[in-house]
Amino acid sequence: MMVMLTGVVFAGELELKDAKGSGLKVISHKTGGQGEITMRMSCSLDKLYFYDAETPKGSFTVMYSPEFFFGGEYGAPQLPVITKLIQIPFGANFRIEVKSYDTQEYNLADYGVSTRIFPRQPSAPKDGSEAPFIYEQSAYVFKGFHGQQLTNIKDIGVMRHMRLAHLTIAPVKYNPIDNKIIVYNNIEFEVIMENADMNKTRAEHENLWSPAFSWMESLVVVPEALRFGERNAVQSYLIVADPAFKDALAPFVAWKTQKGFKVQVVYADQFGTGAAFTAGLKEYIDNLYNNPTADMPAPSYVLFAGDNEKIPAFKGQTNTHITDLYYAAVTPGDFLPDILTGRFSASDLSQLQPQIDKTLEYEKFQFADPSFLDDVVLVAGWDGSWARSHGWPHINYAKKYYINEENGFKNIATYLSAGSHQNEAKIVADVAKGACYVNYTAHGSPTSWADPSFSINNIMSLGNKGKYPFVIGNCCITNKFELPQCFGEAWLRAKDGGAIGYVGASNNSYWDEDFWWGVGLHSIVKPNNDGVPPLKEKTGPGAFEAMFEGNGTSNAGFMMAGNLAVEQSSSSRKQYYWEIYHLMGDPSLKTFMGQPKAMRVSFDNEINARTTSVKVNAPAGSYVGISANDTLLGAAYVDADGSVDVNLSSVPANGEAMVVVTAANAIPFMGKINIR
């Protein structure tokens, strides 16, 4: 049966007057001897809101606070919790010591609450199926106050150079018999990390830190002692390709080299078939990652050039889908990716060539008319139970905070579906005109967005030559790429049309998790008939923050940021989400969000074979690649003062060197240096 919250009446609110703010914050950092690091934190709760809800099991009251999320076992009373991801040094044991807190008991009847606290429900799938209402009666007959442990921290694994832990604070306990709660407020506690191996922690940062992951690092609470700073690291790019695609990929490999990537290509025929293939390729990637060299740093990106028949994916561990995740999850024992991945999914050259051509045209800014980059198409599809509470605010959040005229966008085609199959022709027409970004959230199928419908046939007839968007489908199974051609693959395979990237799921996605994926973790209040978006200051970061605040985060990075929002939550589907979301397209490509601006770049226009470095003046943070004869001579990021000395190696005796400078939302600069 579908969970329907009907007849909603706001019962009241409880102001916690002695609260010292609301939410979680870091108070201080301390480093001691014997590898000890202590981070003192506080958690306060200033207000609780209540509203009544009718369910198949009778009347309940939902209790929530905007800065907090929902915790508890499914079917048991849903109580506020707050969660964070924290970096932990390698080798350290860690624990929490609670130093102080205030407590206050409240009779909920005094605040208009006369029914039981609403039982926590799992998120509903986006496949249109009915979600059963879960109610564990045994959780409502206990005497005394019950709830989650006040503080909890657990190791969740390693992402790139960061060992991560998940912190949960549960400040409310509930007595269902007496209809009372206890609030633990102004909690001060310490996260104590002992016996840290700081040498290994520094070495992991030195060997594995990558600008491709810099935005993800900002989503984590990092102790001061672990803030080693950014490195001017050359980025590394691995391509795993079917051997039949070698010649077609040559211009793509040359361009990535010119941009400043250390590119390595490995061909799929050396890894066998079936399970032997996935095991062999994973071992190859793991070895490359775990044994970085100056010539080949640990790869930041892996591109699979071939479909699932040519480069098989893994079987998912959480359901019956396939997944590329375990090629990227290098660290044993966890499911967090250490590399950003994407696919040029193709069974033959006719499917591969458009993906290469569109990517090169896009990255080189070879548009006849770039004005389409000012345009966006946003669609909240239809579902009678979830569109208004989840789909509408998802889209409205993007418009309110990022995709608007104040940020330079001009034509923002927005469709908030209030019924089935609305505006289908208009949506297709808007995409056909050209857009920099397209986002759909609702139901999907392996061959379409479901409602409003947008099918593979629509993609193939768009005719949006030279006006290719980056597309995200927050919906079910549009990247079910074990099929001959799924919806996500079609966007990339379309010749002279389609998209330069598509992010979607290889299995069912879910309403709550997709909402967090896009806008960041927050309390979802349902119903929300007007689709009011959450306040930005009340949410954690999600994919939209990575897009617009990530300073050049790649398309694969957007996907990772969305999954990290789910990882921070109390969802039971974290590993599942890492498994199902995939990028079709180049993982290093960075979407132009609005028309980019030209950069001012200067350098000496002549060198010789004995030259060991070239000074380049360019915008701070831009990336400089210098190459000759499709060989990388040197690459570096421009310093804050607007210049960088790019160290060179193996300069040829004569000819020309190519200088390529790229930056976030900037037109790429391409110039030449004479070699005398």
Give residue spans per PLM region.
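Extracellular pro-sequences of secreted precursors
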Residues: 10-270, 277-301
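Active-site-adjacent structural elements in enzyme catalytic domains
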Residues: 146, 159-163, 168-174, 182-184, ...
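Active-site-proximal C-terminal subdomain of hydrolase catalytic domains
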Residues: 309, 380, 480-595, 599
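Catalytic cores of nucleophile-dependent amide-cleaving enzymes
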Residues: 321, 325-362, 446-536
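Surface beta-strand/loop "capping" patches
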Residues: 590-620
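Glycine-centered loop-to-beta-strand initiation motif
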Residues: 638-648
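Short, aromatic- and glycine-rich surface loops/edge beta-strands on solvent-exposed regions
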Residues: 654-664
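Edge beta-strands of extracellular beta-sandwich domains
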Residues: 665-676
